Amino acid sequence: MYKIVLVLTLFGAVNGLDKICLGHHAVPNGIIVKTLTNEKEEVTNATETVESKTLDRLCMKGRKYKDLGNCHPIGIIIGAPACDLHLTGRWETLIERENSIAYCYP
């Protein structure tokens, strides 16, 4: 009898794990750097996460997002011409690609 209850409990637990969300969560790593706006800014690094339940901060289902492609977020802020296309529309989450180019103007 206990085995049957245990098996049914396991099936019930596995049933709730049918949705997996992948994402990144930024965590502070303790390194302090000097930036353009702050003398002492703690650097964060992104940690890849896999979640078995929907977390609003990580999952993209039902959210409006903007894929920046090769444009870096700094390029949008400083007004790089290649990033002008990303100034239109509304979005909740930005997707930054690993191969994005950060533009520097003198």
Curated annotation (Swiss-Prot):
GO CC annotation terms, alphabetical: host cell plasma membrane; membrane; viral envelope; virion membrane
Primary location class: virion
Keywords: Clathrin- and caveolin-independent endocytosis of virus by host, Clathrin-mediated endocytosis of virus by host, Disulfide bond, Fusion of virus membrane with host endosomal membrane, Fusion of virus membrane with host membrane, Glycoprotein, Hemagglutinin, Host cell membrane, Host membrane, Host-virus interaction, Lipoprotein, Membrane, Palmitate, Signal, Transmembrane, Viral attachment to host cell, Viral envelope protein, Viral penetration into host cytoplasm, Virion, Virus endocytosis by host, Virus entry into host cell
Localization per Swiss-Prot or TrEMBL: Virion membrane; Host apical cell membrane
Signal sequence range: 1-17
Note: Major glycoprotein, comprises over 80% of the envelope proteins present in virus particle.
Family classification: Belongs to the influenza viruses hemagglutinin family.
Record-given protein name: Hemagglutinin
Species this chain originates from: Influenza A virus (strain A/Duck/Manitoba/1/1953 H10N7)
Lineage, highest ranks first: Viruses, Riboviria, Orthornavirae, Negarnaviricota, Polyploviricotina
